[in-house]
From Swiss-Prot:
Name of the gene this protein is made from: PFA4
UniProt-annotated location(s): Endoplasmic reticulum membrane
Regions of compositional bias (Basic and acidic residues) in chain numbering: 337-352
Keyword Thylakoid: no
PANTHER family: PALMITOYLTRANSFERASE ZDHHC16
Species name: Cryptococcus neoformans var. grubii serotype A (strain H99 / ATCC 208821 / CBS 10515 / FGSC 9487) (Filobasidiella neoformans var. grubii)
Active site: 125 (s-palmitoyl cysteine intermediate)
Name the record gives this protein: Palmitoyltransferase PFA4
Cytoplasmic side of membrane: 1-9, 59-138, 198-456
Biased composition annotated in UniProt, kind: Pro residues: 285-298
Record-annotated DHHC domain positions: 95-145
Residue numbers on the Lumenal membrane side: 31-37, 160-176
TM stretches of this protein: 10-30, 38-58, 139-159, 177-197
Length: 456
């Protein structure tokens, strides 16, 4: 009840603000300016201004009273054909809203303030006391555009009035000054704020996106950049012209005229380059590391991986790793396909309908420079700038040269290291021949300077 009352306050305040900007300027600024007489010049100002005000109120009313679109009562997805539902990746079950106790179609979301699920939810707008969704998104964009048109024309009239006073040295009355100040103080912030908001929503309409889906695309881009999922394409972008037609109507001449939304809001056309019609049911892909039951890491996995257990193309496996792979029995990931909690973020569909988590590393390199990896297999070409992995031997350290060796010798005498405790010469080996490495304390020390003087 409290939320509904506050919603009425927001709507009432918006109506008062629009009315003040639209009518106070006509009654207290424009009408006295033209001597309170009807003329052609006066009509050229009042007719466009009142037309814009009428369209603003009309579209605003439609935004307030038009429902964004609810999920039809009793609507259930066709699980067998996966028609009209958005599946939860991994469990292959449709998205279900526990609060509303019904299934959720693609692009539908639950609004906590309205406490219901809306089709193609964009955001909850307090200024209209309603959510912006499938059936009123066009009304909302038209309302913003008409506010831009009306406030721009209003500011032009106010500036002309100020220039007229300055040019003809006409002494304005106190009422003229006050209402000029009040109109500028109210119209300029509205023009700036609504203007920026309009640009953003027109941008979303050109990409056939919503505010929520804009956040989802940013999150997906981050997952791709970090190599957690395969590169995927936003499925609903079908071209700028078709995108705008899907929101504002099929006739471009009537885009600013209120009209009924086409479609049912349960399914949407998909860009063929992003996949088939089923692609919309797998958007957005989720972070596989945050799933309740993440996929197990196969035994043959390497510590040097690049997303979804795939190899970084800039790293080459060592000979020891290749030998270990050839000797280690391979664990088939299909053994884990019975796990219900597995959530595949993306990938190719298998024959049994599941989604493979393995992927090629190339799609992850969209934001980075890509260098060809080294010749891991016969016949592969070799390029420059190939980073290599150095894998040292545990328990070895390289002794520094120069004065440090002398200081280390003095420390040997003080500590009392015994060479015989750390090294036993082989039979027939001269014990007085310098060795390139020896046991000092806990470490095997390798001295490259001694190696140069070592002779067999």
């Amino acid at each position: 009840m409290a939320a509904r009352n506050w919603s009425r306050v927001w709507v009432g305040g918006t109506v008062i603000l629009i009315s003040f900007i639209a009518f106070s300027s006509q009654i207290f600024v424009i009408w006295p300016w033209y001597g309170r007489e009807i003329s052609l010049d006066l009509l050229m100002l009042l007719v466009p201004l009142n037309l814009a005000a009428f369209m603003i109120f009309w579209n605003y009313r439609l935004c307030v009273i038009t429902s964004p679109g609810t999920v039809p009562e009793g609507w259930r997805p066709n699980i067998g054909a996966m028609d009209g539902m958005e599946v939860k990746k991994g469990t292959h079950t449709p998205r279900y809203c526990k609060n509303c106790a019904h299934y959720k179609p693609p692009r539908a979301h639950h609004c906590r303030q309205c406490k219901t699920c809306w089709l193609k939810l964009d955001h909850h707008c307090p200024w209209i006391g309603n959510c912006v969704g499938f059936y009123n998104q066009g009304h909302f964009i038209r309302f913003l555009l008409w506010v831009d048109i009306g406030t721009t024309f209003h500011l032009i009239i106010m500036v002309r009035r100020v220039l007229y006073i300055a040019e003809y040295y006409h002494e304005p009355t106190l009422a003229d000054v006050l209402f000029l100040v009040f109109n500028f103080a109210t119209c300029v912030p509205v023009w700036l704020c609504v203007g920026m908001f309009s640009i953003y929503h027109v941008y979303l309409a050109c990409g056939n996106s919503t505010t929520i889906e804009g956040w989802e695309k940013d999150k997906v881009a981050t997952l791709i950049r970090r190599g957690k999922i395969k590169e995927v394409k936003y499925p609903y972008n079908i071209g700028i012209y078709k995108n705008i037609k899907s929101v504002l109507g099929p006739n471009p001449l009537l885009w600013l005229w209120p009209q009924k939304m086409q479609g049912d809001g349960l399914s949407f056309p998909v860009n063929p380059s992003a996949g088939d019609h089923m692609t919309q049911y797998f958007w957005p892909p989720q972070d596989p590391s945050r799933l309740p039951n993440p996929p197990p890491i196969p035994a043959h996995a390497s510590p040097f991986v690049y997303g979804n257990n795939g190899f970084n193309p800039n790293l080459r496996p060592t000979n020891s790793l290749r030998a270990r792979r050839s000797s280690t029995p391979r664990i088939d990931e299909d053994e884990y396909s019975h796990e219900q909690g597995r959530h595949y973020s993306s990938g190719d569909e298998r024959d049994n309908g599941s989604i493979s988590a393995s992927s090629s590393p190339e799609p992850y390199l969209s934001d980075y420079d890509h260098y060809d990896e080294g010749p891991m297999y016969p016949g592969e070409r070799m390029t420059t700038l190939v980073p290599r992995v150095r894998r040292g031997s545990e328990g070895w350290e390289v002794a520094p040269g120069g004065g440090w060796n002398a200081y280390a010798g003095m420390m040997d005498e003080e500590v009392g290291w015994d060479d015989e405790a750390g090294y036993d010469e082989a039979p027939g080996e001269d014990p007085y021949v310098e060795r390139p490495w020896e046991m000092r304390g806990r470490y095997n020390v390798y001295d490259p300077e001694e190696e140069s003087g070592y002779t067999h």
